[in-house]
Design a protein with these regions (language model features):
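C-terminal boundary/linker segments immediately following FHA domains
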Residues: 5-7, 28, 36, 43, ...
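Short, solvent-exposed loop/turn segments at secondary-structure junctions
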Residues: 13, 48-49
Length: 90
């Protein structure tokens, strides 16, 4: 199992956001031992949503697939697969 943090600053995956719609620590995605992805909103100010059946569904926690579109802070959206490619090397 591997956990990646997502946010505006100091996280594994940094989302640039001059408007500060994305929290410093906005969400976490856990890659499970069987290869699934579990997305958790970390109490962000502006929420996390997944696009399902053509509509944005706010989530606190949910399993998501690589091809699903995820939205952070009301405007920053991309597929989970694209997001995972943005991981910083340490």
């Amino acid at each position: 199992m591997r956990i990646l943090t997502i946010g505006r600053k100091g996280t594994d995956i940094v989302l640039n956001d001059s408007e500060k719609q994305i929290s410093r620590l906005h969400a976490e995605v856990t890659v499970t031992d069987d290869g699934r992805y579990y997305l958790v909103d970390c109490g962000s100010s502006n929420g996390t949503a997944v696009k399902r059946q053509g509509a944005w569904k706010p989530i606190k926690q949910a399993f998501v697939s690589e091809d699903e579109e995820v939205r952070f802070g009301g405007f920053y959206s991309l597929t989970l697969g694209t997001l995972l490619k943005m991981k910083r090397s340490k």
